[in-house]
A protein has these predicted regions:
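Hydrophobic alpha-helical segments in the ANL/AMP-binding
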Residues: 5-24, 33-34, 125-127, 147-159, ...
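Conserved AMP-binding/adenylation subdomain of ANL enzymes
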Residues: 119-187, 202
Length: 470
C-alpha cells in the first residue's frame, strides 16, 4: 500500500496477535513480489488497489497457496473488530517485523527485528529528530520501507509527536511538499538527500514555513552544497543521521553538537561504533575504516537479529565480536564521522582509494550538475579510473568543453588523482525504489563494454592527459 492510515492499524494489530508483517512498497513488479513470497514463505498479502499493484500481486501469486486480502476486506474488518484484541504472549527476542533491503549491491535480504526494536527509535525521534509533545512530524517515506518505522511510528509516538501522513501518486514535486508543509503547519521534516536536492531549486518565498523548525536527512550521504543552499533558503541547519535497514539511527547530529555540512555526526547512545581496517584493527582519526558496532556489551537496542533464513550471511556480518555494516567512513579530530561509501563503491586507482561521495560533492558544486554518480571503470594502467555519470541542469549541454570544465573544476578543489577521467551525460540515474543510486548497476553496464577508454572517449569524454598517455 501507499501512505495510508490503515497501515498503522494493521501494523499494531499484527504486532498484538503474533503475525509477522513484511511491509512492502507498492512500486514492486510481479517478479519482485514473487521473490518475496518465495523467500519469506508468505501466507497472506494485504493489498490496497492503488494502480497496477493488484494485478502484479495476482500474477506473482499464481497457483500458490497465498491468501489475498483486499482493501474492502480490511475496511470491513476494521469496522467490525472488537475494541480490544487478545494479545499473543511474546518475548522481546521474538521476531516482530521483517524488512527487505532495497538491494543496492545484491538481491534484497530479509532483515528481522525483534520486539525491542521500537525502543531503539527513542534515539531516532527524541535525540536525532528532536521531537517532543506538540510537534507535527513529516517523514516522506512510504509505508513499505524501514524508514517508515524510523520516522512515522514507534519513536515519534514515544516522543508524543503527531505523525503527518501525506499520500500522493507518482513523484511529488517541490510545490507539493512545500505546500503540504505550509498548509499543515509542519514543525519537523525528514527526507533523503534526493528530495532536498529537488527542494533547493524551489522558490521558498512562496510558502509560509514559519512553523518548520527542524529538518533531518538520511538515506545517503548529504552533499555540503545541498546543506548550505537549504540553510540559506530556510535558515534551518540539516541534521544528518546514519543507519541501515538493519539498525535504527546509530550516528547522528544531535541538538548538543553543531552540524558540520556533510558529516553524519557522532554515535548514538548505546552504540559503540568503531572504524576497523581489513584486519579488524581500529584506525586512527582521518583514516578510512569500516563502520562496525561492538557487541561486547550485547546487541544495542534496535540492532537486527539477523537475516531471516540466511545463517551464512548473518555470520558474515556478525563476526569477531562486531556487527560489520559494509559501509566505510572516517572520523575527524573532533569526533565527527564522515561517510565515504560502501566498501564495494570505493575506487582504487593508481594505489589510491577514492570516495565516490567526495568527488560527487565537488561536482555538485558546479552549476551544470543536477545529479551525479561516481564509479570506477577498469583501466589497464591504473587498475581503475574514476568515472562520473552526470545528469545536467536545464540549459546545459554535454559538450567536450563542459567535460574539460568539470574535470578542471574537480582538479582545482581536490587531489588530482580523484578527478573523473571519463564523464558520461545521461537523462537519469538508475535508482532503487527507495531512491538510492544504483552504482553497482552502473558498474555492471560499464563492464559490459568491450574496452574501457578507447571506445568511449568520443562519446563520454576523455581527458587530454589520458589521450597523451595512450
Amino acid at each position: 500500500m501507499r501512505r495510508r492510515w490503515e497501515y498503522w492499524i494493521l501494523m499494531l494489530a499484527m504486532h498484538k496477535i503474533g503475525v509477522i508483517p513484511i511491509p512492502s512498497t507498492n512500486q514492486l513488479k510481479a517478479e519482485d513480489i514473487e521473490y518475496r513470497i518465495e523467500q519469506a514463505e508468505s501466507k497472506a498479502i494485504i493489498v490496497f488497489d492503488d494502480g497496477h499493484i493488484l494485478n502484479e500481486i495476482k500474477t506473482a501469486i499464481g497457483n500458490r497457496n497465498v491468501q489475498l486480502i483486499s482493501n474492502d476486506e480490511v475496511a470491513k474488518s476494521i469496522s467490525t473488530m472488537p475494541d480490544t484484541l487478545e494479545r499473543v504472549p511474546n518475548e522481546n527476542s521474538d521476531t516482530m517485523v521483517i524488512y527487505f533491503t532495497s538491494g543496492t549491491t545484491d538481491m534484497p535480504k530479509m532483515v528481522a527485528h525483534n520486539f525491542a526494536y521500537p525502543l531503539g527509535h527513542i534515539n531516532t525521534a527524541m535525540f536525532w529528530q528532536r521531537l517532543h509533545d506538540g510537534d507535527i512530524h513529516f517523514t516522506l517515506s512510504e509505508s513499505g520501507w524501514a524508514k517508515c518505522s524510523w520516522g512515522k511510528m514507534y519513536g515519534q509516538w514515544l516522543a508524543g509527536a503527531t505523525v503527518f501522513v501525506f499520500d500522493f501518486s507518482g513523484i511529488a514535486t517541490a510545490h507539493d511538499l512545500l505546500s503540504a508543509m505550509a498548509e499543515n503547519h509542519i514543525t519537523s521534516f525528514c527526507a533523503p538527500p534526493t528530495v532536498y536536492k529537488m527542494l533547493i531549486h524551489a522558490d521558498f518565498s512562496k510558502y509560509d514555513l514559519s512553523a518548520l523548525t527542524k529538518a533531518d536527512v538520511a538515506g545517503e550521504a548529504l552533499n555540503p552544497e545541498v546543506f548550505e543552499r537549504f540553510q540559506k533558503a530556510t535558515g534551518i541547519k540539516l541534521h544528518e543521521g546514519f543507519g541501515q535497514t538493519e539498525t535504527c539511527v546509530m550516528m547522528f547530529t544531535s541538538q548538543w553538537i553543531e552540524p558540520k555540512p556533510g558529516s553524519m555526526g557522532m554515535p548514538a547512545a548505546g552504540w559503540d561504533v568503531q572504524l576497523l581496517d581489513e584486519g579488524g584493527r581500529p584506525v586512527p582519526n582521518g583514516t578510512v575504516g569500516e563502520i562496525c558496532v561492538s557487541l561486547k556489551n550485547g546487541h544495542p537496542v534496535g540492532l537486527f537479529q539477523g537475516y531471516h533464513k540466511n545463517d551464512k550471511l548473518t555470520s558474515k556480518v556478525f563476526r569477531d565480536g562486531f556487527y560489520h555494516t559494509g559501509d566505510v567512513a572516517y572520523r575527524d579530530n573532533d569526533g565527527y564521522y564522515w561517510f565515504v561509501g560502501r566498501n564495494d563503491d570505493l575506487i582504487k586507482t593508481s594505489g589510491y582509494r577514492v570516495s565516490p561521495f567526495e568527488v560527487e560533492s565537488v561536482l555538485l558544486e558546479h552549476p551544470a550538475v543536477r545529479e551525479v554518480a561516481v564509479t570506477g571503470i577498469p583501466d589497464p594502467s591504473r587498475g581503475m579510473a574514476v568515472k562520473a555519470t552526470i545528469v545536467l541542469n536545464k540549459y546545459f549541454q554535454g559538450t567536450d568543453v563542459l567535460i574539460r570544465q568539470l574535470q578542471d573544476h574537480v582538479r582545482a578543489r581536490t587531489a588530482s588523482y580523484k578527478y573523473p577521467r571519463v564523464i558520461e551525460f545521461v537523462d537519469s540515474l538508475p535508482m532503487t525504489i527507495s531512491g538510492k543510486i544504483r552504482r553497482a548497476l552502473i558498474r555492471t553496464l560499464d563492464s559490459a563494454k568491450d574496452t574501457i577508454i578507447e571506445p568511449v572517449k568520443n562519446v563520454i569524454g576523455l581527458s587530454k592527459d589520458d589521450e597523451k598517455q595512450k
